Amino acid sequence: MLITIEGIDGSGKSTLLARLRELLADLDPLFTREPGATWVGESVRRAIAERMDPITEALLFCADHAAHIDTVIRPALDEGRLVISDRYADSRFAYQPVVLDGVLPDPLSWLRRIHEGWSIRPDRTFLLVLPVEDAVSRLGPEKKREYFENAAILEQVQENYLNLAAADPLRFVVVDALLPKEEVARFIAGEIRAGARSSRRRPRA
């Protein structure tokens, strides 16, 4: 079973995932993340830091996703393990269209075509949503933020996320990230447990 956790920067994913490790320890899930679970992730981080051109950056994210699936996710799913990923393909579908706006005529369609035939569809995606001003306030001093960690960009990203969720309501669970952190964590842990009891591998996207 593949679970993904999504949300804009400052939505509380890191805190949530740390608590899920505790609440779901008996299920022995594999926790992973994008980017960063593979060596390609190093190139992605460099691209972000050095502000490479948008298409190069997007393709590096896709390359990291491919390596992540091949070396981490697919082997774990083949063993019947529960996999929980901090970000996945939906992060690209939410963030990169903002970066690629004006570069390509239809960035989302372009990104979806790149993923066709090999990306694995998550069984469930939990999307943490909160007012952007609250998310930005959690990110610390502005001078230490990455270029996409500003309110104008995050507003567009969250709108993209909500559009993705509206288009795929059977997979997405939208969660109010302003609720108490323990309440959020226990709700999501309960949903994951319920799904794990009856899960069957879904076909690739």
UniProtKB/Swiss-Prot annotation:
<dbReference type="InterPro" id="IPR018094">
    <property type="entry name" value="Thymidylate_kinase"/>
</dbReference>
<keyword id="KW-0545">Nucleotide biosynthesis</keyword>
<dbReference type="GO" id="GO:0006227">
    <property type="term" value="P:dUDP biosynthetic process"/>
</dbReference>
<feature type="binding site">
    <location>
        <begin position="7"/>
        <end position="14"/>
    </location>
    <ligand>
        <name>ATP</name>
    </ligand>
</feature>
<keyword id="KW-0547">Nucleotide-binding</keyword>
<dbReference type="GO" id="GO:0004798">
    <property type="term" value="F:dTMP kinase activity"/>
</dbReference>
<comment type="similarity">
    <text>Belongs to the thymidylate kinase family.</text>
</comment>
<keyword id="KW-0418">Kinase</keyword>
<dbReference type="InterPro" id="IPR039430">
    <property type="entry name" value="Thymidylate_kin-like_dom"/>
</dbReference>
<keyword id="KW-0808">Transferase</keyword>
<dbReference type="Pfam" id="PF02223">
    <property type="entry name" value="Thymidylate_kin"/>
</dbReference>
<dbReference type="GO" id="GO:0005524">
    <property type="term" value="F:ATP binding"/>
</dbReference>
<keyword id="KW-0067">ATP-binding</keyword>
<dbReference type="GO" id="GO:0006235">
    <property type="term" value="P:dTTP biosynthetic process"/>
</dbReference>
<dbReference type="GO" id="GO:0005737">
    <property type="term" value="C:cytoplasm"/>
</dbReference>
<dbReference type="InterPro" id="IPR027417">
    <property type="entry name" value="P-loop_NTPase"/>
</dbReference>
<dbReference type="GO" id="GO:0006233">
    <property type="term" value="P:dTDP biosynthetic process"/>
</dbReference>
<protein>
    <recommendedName>
        <fullName>Probable thymidylate kinase</fullName>
        <ecNumber>2.7.4.9</ecNumber>
    </recommendedName>
</protein>
